[in-house]
Amino acid sequence: IDANILVRMNNGAKGVIRSSQIATGEENNLRVNVYGDKGYLKWQQENPNKLYFLKENEPIRVLKPGHDYNYPISLNSSKLPPGHPEGIFDAMGNIYLGAAKAIRGDNFYDHEFPTIHEGVRGMDFIEKVIDSHNRGNVWLELEK
């Protein structure tokens, strides 16, 4: 640990801030733990969609973004419905980046983005699911 900082809040609450720039085995494990005499809150940057909340003599609750039990400021910060990680936009952007490279004629990696073949295969899969259901849930082969 590179630093231990003792703090006292305006209301008299005491706390400790512990920090380390380098900790063996950790990547970027930014976390915030708030312990009180009647419960605690825990949050980790590597698992950002969960806030652990414990009140004395109650089971641990896991709070997630986008749900009505959150405060309005939290709901306003969530851009997607519950269950969708905020990073989904970055993931989609990576797919679009690969496609843009191909359109521009730049070098790109094989399988960097789905091609027409994967799109047609996905549509075939959906058609087979519906067809299987309509025929009494029989096994069907996908086109190669």
What are these regions (language model features)?
Residues 131-144:
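C-terminal capping/lid region of NAD(P)-dependent oxidoreductase domains
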Residues 4, 14-20:
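NAD(P)-dependent dehydrogenases' Rossmann-like dinucleotide-binding region
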Residues 1-11, 33, 38-113, 117:
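C-terminal glycine/acidic-rich active-site capping loop/insertion
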Residues 13, 26-30:
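Glycine/proline-rich active-site loop of Rossmann-fold NAD(P)-dependent oxidoreductases
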Residues 18-22, 35-37, 143:
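Glycine-rich Rossmann NAD(P)(H)-binding loop
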Residues 18-27, 84-87:
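Glycine-rich phosphate/pyrophosphate-binding beta-alpha loops
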Residues 119-133:
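C-terminal hydrophobic helical "lid"/dimerization subdomain
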